[in-house]
């Protein structure tokens, strides 16, 4: 199982603001692009992949939208507007939820009112966490453990205070090269590396 977490610090947690954020300062299109490249391949979708989108621009609780490739049925296509609409439906389903609650949105998609920190604590129990960092070990040379989970961010970098807590959870730093890439591009390179390894 391959897992990915996209920490979208600028992404709003209301569907209206999310949709308005496409192509604007919040850059919510990053969510759709990352979903597309995480879940889909030509004429099909990947098996055994989970992506967690953590939307943090909120007045109450972060929203973690989880998509499981083995369980999705008909998401309606893989173009940007369709995928953003799926995220918007999850946000609509989360209205009125209290802290750390879970709701199923549709087959393969759930929404939780849980923070990035809490999510990665849970994932660390049965996943090896990897954070992308230009100073990390080059992915071609890195040993990738079982149940890898790759941590990504939107255009706002990971807060420095998060590094220490991630280190305590055993997170390893890996690099995809000297250039800063979009999260959706990182996903493609990670999948390609693991595909080559037949992981």
Swiss-Prot record:
Keywords: Cytoplasm, Methyltransferase, S-adenosyl-L-methionine, Transferase. It holds the Pfam family Methyltrn_RNA_2. The keyword Zinc does not apply. GO terms for biological process: tRNA methylation. InterPro entries: Alpha/beta_knot_MTases, TrmY, tRNA_m1G_MTases_N. It is an enzyme of class 2 (transferase). It comes from the Bacteria. Its main location: cytoplasm. One of its GO terms (cellular component) is cytoplasm. GO terms for molecular function: S-adenosylmethionine-dependent methyltransferase activity; tRNA methyltransferase activity. S-adenosyl-L-methionine binds at residues 132, 186. It is found in: Cytoplasm. Its EC number is 2.1.1.-. Belongs to the methyltransferase superfamily. TrmY family. This is Putative pseudouridine methyltransferase.
């Amino acid at each position: 199982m391959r897992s990915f977490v996209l920490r979208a610090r600028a992404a709003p947690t209301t569907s209206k603001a999310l949709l308005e954020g496409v192509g604007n300062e919040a850059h919510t299109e990053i969510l759709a692009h990352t979903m597309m490249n995480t879940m889909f391949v030509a004429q099909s979708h990947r098996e055994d992949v989970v992506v967690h989108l953590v939307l943090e621009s909120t007045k109450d609780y972060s929203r973690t939208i989880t998509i499981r490739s083995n369980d999705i049925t008909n998401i309606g296509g893989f173009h940007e507007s369709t995928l953003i609409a799926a995220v918007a439906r999850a946000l609509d389903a989360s209205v009125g939820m209290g802290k750390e609650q879970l709701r199923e949105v549709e087959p393969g998609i759930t929404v939780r009112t849980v923070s990035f920190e809490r999510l990665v604590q849970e994932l660390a129990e049965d996943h090896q966490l990897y954070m992308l960092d230009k100073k990390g070990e080059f992915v071609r040379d890195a040993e990738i453990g079982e149940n890898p989970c790759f941590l990504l961010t939107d255009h706002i970098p990971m807060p420095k205070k998060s590094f220490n807590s991630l280190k305590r959870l055993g997170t390893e730093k890996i690099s995809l090269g000297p250039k800063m890439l979009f999260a959706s591009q990182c996903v493609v390179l990670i999948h390609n590396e693991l595909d080559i390894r037949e992981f």
